[in-house]
Amino acid sequence: MGKKKRSTSKKKKTSTKKEEEEIKLEEIDKSKVSLKDAETLQAEMNLGMIGHVDHGKTTLTEALSGVWTDKYSEEIERGISIKLGYADAIIAKCKECPEPDCYWTKQMIKEEYQKDKRKKVKYDKCPTCGGDIEFLRKIAFVDAPGHEILMATMLSGASLMDGACLLVAADEKVPQPQTKEHLAALEIMGIEDIVIVQNKIDAREKEEVVENYKQIKEFIKGSTVKDAPIIPISAAFKVNLHELLMYIEKNIPTPERDLEKEDCRFYVARSFDVNKPGTEIDDLQGGVIGGTLSGGILRVGDEIEIKPGIRVDNKYIELNSTIQSISVGSKLVEAAGPG
């Protein structure tokens, strides 16, 4: 996320060693990164949560990250996602437990410890066996709305995704309208790293869940994701999340990033006006834009060009500005890499 305002500052041509170390994730020895330290890292992969309305995308995002992404009053009132939601999750692995029980997120570790109020949360120790926990990677969830009229919002989010979880509810016939449309959107975008999540298995009897599974298999037959794993879960009751994480780790890799790329492109998914009504002109702050960087490095002080810009007399005029601040999640940083 970059914040810009009117400025005459010159473009910075160099960065400090600290900045370079901060963003070159591939040069970090992950075996030495604690889960606490991982909070300061930039997410290295964007994972889309897609599927029909009310199939559990936001609930699953919260179960894995601890963040409920529906934050706007209308979303809360209507009980559906309207805008793209974002949340980071730190994925870790116990060195002692067998698969799939060895896979955790930081949030899952916290909640498992909190089941016993006598225990103190230890992010470096497995809450099940006490074995050492190792950091695997930090990912960002892009929670896309599933309602028909919000398809344009979902498509803007798809441009940010490196992979996706396609959620299909076990208590409804397959496929639902947006299940088909969201899968078609992924195929058009060329996103092939997909895990299919059969959610709400708690809402039906075993025989009905098995029949629903067969419907999913029939639905994806002949598609680009015909061989994608189908993982049955209950996001609401947090059942089978370890299994899901294992398949995410094995089927959705972190894409290769080019930090040296000169054509530095930032795809904008959302924007904010942080100015309060009645703010004097001299006190106006620039807009805030959120999205993902495809390659290269952005630094505070860099000059940027926003396209297509603003429309004047049926023509678009590009906007030029300077980056005043950069935040990754809630952390202010001096520079950011792809992701």
What are these model-derived regions, one by one?
Residues 3-6, 13, 17-66, 137-141, ...:
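Helix-rich terminal scaffold detector
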Residues 136-140, 144-150, 159-181, 187-210:
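Conserved Switch II/interswitch segment of TRAFAC-class P-loop GTPases
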Residues 16-152, 161:
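P-loop NTPase switch module centered on the Walker A-proximal segment
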Residues 28-30, 39, 218-339:
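Conserved catalytic-core segments of large NTP-driven translation/proteostasis enzymes
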Residues 52-53, 65, 147, 169-173, ...:
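Short, ordered loop/turn segments at secondary-structure junctions
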Residues 65, 69, 73, 77, ...:
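Signal for well-folded cores of large energy- and translation-related assemblies
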